[in-house]
């Protein structure tokens, strides 16, 4: 091999290595890493945030249960150790519905938990799977009124941003980790609006499952990690590992932003 070809090969190898290093989920760790800095977590979402299990009875009828103790959020809390986490989530939830069911008039399947009563040090937000069937996606840069969230537009982007704004009235410095939807559940336009939150608000970080997550629709993945149409216990545990890996990646690159995390009450 002449020197020119050798340099081309080395250059390609370096490019591929750099690309792999920029993939936060290139290697999924079971270790919570820097997630241990956060001792009080809030989990905002729908069925996939609630550990929902789906199965079919012998008579063919479907059953859905929010099994919170198996949710990825509670698996993160267990891995961190000495932490607490609150599931502000339920099956079928949307961004618009969340504001009603967990903020304005708390009536939900998690014992009517009120998100205003449990301010947290950090939040993971995973909504959108149900929204895409019920509301226009909107444009976060136009639909979010940074001065008055009650004037946000009647769109997914408006309500999603409104959740961050409402929670920030309790915890102005709390970091948010917003999750794009895996390809099986997602919609590119909705995921684009979720990513936009990191450009609009400070201290918001994207967990980009649409871009870096596994393919949820392969026969092997579904056999291992699904129970009918939702994840099984192993699937929620895998999700917890992915989220911890991704959050650790973000914190490692932004440690100064987390310098005062221990002072958030």
What are the residue ranges of the model-derived segments?
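Serine-esterase "nucleophile elbow" of acetyl-processing enzymes
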Residues: 21-89
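Oxyanion-hole/transition-state-stabilizing segment in secreted/luminal serine hydrolases
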Residues: 95-154
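Positively charged n-region of N-terminal signal peptides that target proteins for export
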Residues: 1-6
């Amino acid at each position: 091999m002449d020197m020119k070809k050798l340099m081309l090969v080395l250059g390609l190898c370096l490019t591929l290595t750099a690309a792999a290093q920029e993939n936060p989920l290139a290697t999924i760790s079971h270790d919570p890493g820097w997630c241990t800095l956060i001792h009080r977590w809030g989990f905002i979402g729908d069925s996939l945030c609630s550990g929902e299990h789906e199965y079919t009875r012998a008579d063919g009828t479907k059953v859905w249960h929010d099994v919170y103790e198996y949710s990825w959020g509670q698996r993160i809390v267990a891995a961190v150790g000495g932490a607490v986490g609150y599931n502000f989530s339920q099956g079928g939830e949307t961004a618009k519905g969340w504001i009603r069911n967990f903020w304005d008039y708390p009536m939900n399947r998690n014992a009517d938990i009120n998100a205003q009563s449990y301010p947290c040090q950090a939040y993971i937000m995973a909504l959108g799977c149900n929204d895409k069937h019920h509301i226009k996606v909107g444009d976060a840069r136009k639909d979010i009124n940074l001065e008055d969230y009650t004037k946000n537009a009647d769109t997914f982007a408006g309500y999603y941003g409104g959740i961050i704004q409402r929670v920030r009235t309790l915890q102005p410095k709390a970091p948010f980790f917003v999750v794009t939807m895996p390809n099986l559940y997602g919609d590119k336009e909705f995921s684009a609006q979720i990513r936009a939150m990191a450009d609009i608000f400070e201290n918001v970080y994207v967990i980009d499952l649409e871009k870096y997550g596994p393919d949820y629709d392969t026969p092997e993945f579904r056999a291992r990690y699904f129970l009918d149409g939702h994840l099984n216990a192993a699937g929620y545990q895998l999700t917890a590992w992915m989220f911890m890996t991704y959050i650790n990646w973000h914190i490692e690159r932004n440690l100064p932003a987390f310098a005062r995390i221990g002072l958030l009450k």
